[in-house]
Amino acid sequence: MATPQSVFVFAICILMITELILASKSYYDILGVPKSASERQIKKAFHKLAMKYHPDKNKSPDAEAKFREIAEAYETLSDANSRKEYDTIGHSAFTNGKGQRGNGSPFEQSFNFNFDDLFKDFNFFGQNQNTRSKKHFENHFHTRQDGSSRQRHHFQEFSFGGGLFDDMFEDMEKMFSFSGFDTTNRHTVQTENRFHGSSKHCRTVTQRRGNMVTTYTDCSGQ
């Protein structure tokens, strides 16, 4: 027969186990989306939370940990295969298995693109914070910058090594309605400058083929 003390201990253990289970949020809970969320909903939720909790924008002590948690959730749910596995085996089994497989943090991925242009064009955190924000992202994602010049005024090439920012740039092109953009994979922005009485027309051309994005300025004058 169970004693009152053993029953009490058993009840305490059940409560502790329940609290641990509830404390372990799913990736859907972290992003604030339902399990049936579409790819688009997941992208929007990630972008909103990443902007809110980025340590250069949010000064709370737990902002960086929250930012990493958000990125980890998005990394999994934005990939169809990873999301399917996650939904099948559950949060605990997936995260434990992920550590054993050596996938590590999403911040260990390698990204090759120019952060100066990123913060200059989209001005995430204000003009006075561009440099600090750029360095913070570089430190998190182990970014290697690589720029090259061509005869067409300037040429920059970005090679996306992972999927974390690939979708972000795609959505940003739609978010910021630059004049002259179309809905194809080839986007142009046209500007006009006059030098010493002559007319010079310049356009910035951005081309995307797969994971490779190239940008250059093409000018023609009379």
UniProtKB/Swiss-Prot annotation:
The modification Phosphoserine is found at residue 133. Gene3D superfamilies: DnaJ domain. It is found in: Endoplasmic reticulum lumen. Residues 26-90 form the J domain. Its main location: endoplasmic reticulum. Coiled coil: none annotated. Residues 91-222 are annotated as: Divergent targeting domain. One of its GO terms (cellular component) is endoplasmic reticulum lumen. Residues 1-23 form the signal peptide. Disruption phenotype: Perinatal death in approximately half of knockout mice. Death is caused by fetal growth restriction, reduced hepatic glycogen stores and hypoglycemia. Surviving adult mice display constitutive endoplasmic reticulum stress in multiple cells and tissues. Elevated endoplasmic reticulum stress in pancreatic beta cells is associated with beta cell loss, hypoinsulinemia and glucose intolerance Conditional knockout mice lacking Dnajb9 in bone marrow show impaired hematopoiesis: the number of myeloid cells is increased, while the number of erythroid and B lymphoid cells is reduced. InterPro entries: DnaJ_domain, DnaJ_domain_CS, Hsp70_co-chaperone_J-domain, J_dom_sf. One of its GO terms (molecular function) is misfolded protein binding. Keywords: Chaperone, Endoplasmic reticulum, Phosphoprotein, Signal, Unfolded protein response. One of its GO terms (biological process) is negative regulation of IRE1-mediated unfolded protein response. Not N-glycosylated. SMART domains: DnaJ (SM00271). It comes from the Eukaryota. Interacts with HSPA5/BiP; interaction is direct. Interacts with ERN1/IRE1 (via the luminal region). Interacts with DERL1. Co-chaperone for Hsp70 protein HSPA5/BiP that acts as a key repressor of the ERN1/IRE1-mediated unfolded protein response (UPR). J domain-containing co-chaperones stimulate the ATPase activity of Hsp70 proteins and are required for efficient substrate recognition by Hsp70 proteins. In the unstressed endoplasmic reticulum, interacts with the luminal region of ERN1/IRE1 and selectively recruits HSPA5/BiP: HSPA5/BiP disrupts the dimerization of the active ERN1/IRE1 luminal region, thereby inactivating ERN1/IRE1. The J domain stimulates the ATPase activity of HSPA5/BiP, while the divergent targeting domain is required for efficient substrate recognition by HSPA5/BiP. The divergent targeting domain specifically recognizes and binds to aggregation-prone sequences. This is DnaJ homolog subfamily B member 9. It comes from Mus musculus (Mouse).
